Amino acid sequence: MLSSANSINVGRLVPQVVYYFAAYAQLLRAGAIEAGDAVEFCVPTGNFGDILAGYYAKRMGLPVAKLVVASDKNNVLADFLTTGVYDRNRPFFTTISPSMDILISSNLERMLYFLSDGDCELVAGLMEQLAQTGRYEVPAELLATIQSVFGCGWASEDEVRAAIKSCWDANGYVIDPHTACGYHVFEQVAPAVGAKARVLLSTASPYKFPRACCEALGLNVPEDDFEAMRVLEQATNTVAPAQLAELESKPVRFEDVCDVDEMASYVESAAKRMSTN
């Protein structure tokens, strides 16, 4: 079966709805909220997938006060949610939060569909503008509707590193660079009106990005990722997930690299190989 691995695949996106209900249930058990209280969620995102799952949770009835988008230096989403103009015609930055290094957020189309009350003609027109010119602007009324549901903010590289250090110093909790974008944004954005609690979604293990975390914490930064994991373990008295640590001794399974113009022929040849196995 050929399938997309990222959140444009609704099969990966829909299960993420569970995060929001699970977080709400934890707050209830902790006595932090009462049933029916509204909660604000801050979500580090690039492809608008995880936070769209939060919007689905809201539509399912979860009391959500606001969904706050946290971007990295590639802040096309933050700009869009502020101005109503989506413009991918800008520099692309390679950051220490690579999963958010995106200039075209695939799932935004799904959000536009829902918040425009299913106006397929409008959404199709916007997507055509994006394909042809790299930008589009939503009507003012639609922007107001979007802003009533979504807040936003972004963090520079230095702010991401500072957030990792700040969270460790304040809480003894190590966060990865993506989560650090959200940590910074939550500190900068005022709580949503009516929110009884605020939740930051921690989106990845810091051990997936051990060198960036070591650097942010002022530790020795080995060139080797696995050595950096060990430095991080010793300094923070935490343990790397076994699934990551064991990769050091695992054989490399996939070594093929192909250019974009070779993709179609590669997929065809791979499919033929699979069909004979």
Please describe what each predicted stretch is.
Residues 1-277:
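PLP-dependent amino-acid enzyme catalytic core
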